[in-house]
Structures are given as structure tokens and as C-alpha cells.
Swiss-Prot record:
Keywords: Allergen, Pathogenesis-related protein, Plant defense. It comes from Alnus glutinosa (European alder). InterPro entries: Bet_v_I/MLP, Bet_v_I_allergen, Plant_def-hormone_signal, START-like_dom_sf. This is Major pollen allergen Aln g 1. PANTHER family: OS08G0374000 PROTEIN-RELATED, STRESS-INDUCED PROTEIN SAM22. GO terms for cellular component: cytoplasm; nucleus.
Length: 160
């Protein structure tokens, strides 16, 4: 088994606390609303949203994958940090054992924020992660962030 790390940062004009509330704490409801082309539904299969919770994210028809199951590993409301692992579905299977993700939202000097993402791909056997796979996953994450950002800009009273 190998572990391949990937880190990225994406700026946002939305303040960290507001972005964390919308994107992380209420993302299960908000993402299918603002990005239905990317997320059809999110349901809690087990747990209350805190560590140990298992969520099933279903993707729209025509997506490369039907669904993923994620386990919530950490929700830090003070430091705006969220960690979760993809444990089933999606790319997890023959080549990947799991994908561990950490999202941290930090304040930016301009009043906005910076979304810091860390991914650890745990491969099976001697499988490797190629750069194209990582690029696709980053583009998806940025797309979701921008959809939430657009919603928040259009709804200035939401998630304050």
C-alpha cells in the first residue's frame, strides 16, 4: 500500500466563519441546492453529523461514479477544520483503499478566506495516483466552493 499526498489552496471572498457554516456545517443541504449537476443528495446513514458519522453522497446520472460513502473524522468549529474519509464508492475499490481529506478554512488579510485542502490517497498494492485524477478532484472541489460562494454573494443574509 502507498500513500500519495496532495495539498491545494483556493482563495474565497467569503469570510472564514461564514464559509465554514455554509460549505461544511450545512453543506449536506446546500450543495444539492447550489450544485445539482455535481451532487444529487447527501444523507446521513449513521450518526449525528459529528465524528463517526457515515454519509452517502449520491451523484447525478451521467457522473463517473454513482455514489460515495464518507466517514466524518473531525469537525472543529473553532478552527474551521473538517476531516473526512471516503470509505466506499467512487474511486475506492480495486486501486484505492480510502481517501482521507482535511479541509481548513483560514482568514485572509483582505477579509475573505483561504480554503486549504489536504488529500491522502491510500492505494492498494502498487497502484499509483496519476496527476490527471488529482486535477479532476481539485476542479470538482473548487467548483463546489465557487457554487457556495456565488450563493452566499447572492444571499447576503444567509449563514451570518
Amino acid at each position: 500500500m502507498g500513500v500519495f499526498n496532495y495539498e491545494a489552496e483556493t482563495p474565497s471572498v467569503i469570510p472564514a466563519a461564514r464559509l465554514f457554516k455554509a460549505f461544511i456545517l450545512d453543506g449536506d443541504k446546500l450543495l444539492p441546492k447550489v450544485a445539482p449537476e455535481a451532487v444529487s443528495s447527501v444523507e446521513n446513514i449513521e450518526g449525528n453529523g459529528g465524528p463517526g458519522t457515515i454519509k452517502k453522497i449520491t451523484f447525478p446520472e451521467g457522473s463517473p461514479f454513482k455514489y460515495v460513502k464518507e466517514r466524518v473524522d473531525e469537525v472543529d468549529r473553532v478552527n474551521f477544520k473538517y476531516s473526512f474519509s471516503v470509505i466506499e464508492g467512487g474511486a475506492v475499490g480495486d486501486a484505492l483503499e480510502k481517501v482521507c481529506n482535511e479541509i481548513k478554512i483560514v482568514a485572509a488579510p483582505d477579509g475573505g478566506s483561504i480554503l486549504k485542502i489536504s488529500n491522502k490517497f491510500h492505494t492498494k498494492g502498487d497502484h499509483e495516483i496519476n496527476a490527471e485524477q488529482i486535477k479532476i478532484e481539485k476542479e470538482k472541489a473548487v467548483g463546489l466552493l465557487k457554487a457556495v460562494e456565488s450563493y452566499l454573494l447572492a444571499h447576503s443574509d444567509a449563514y451570518n
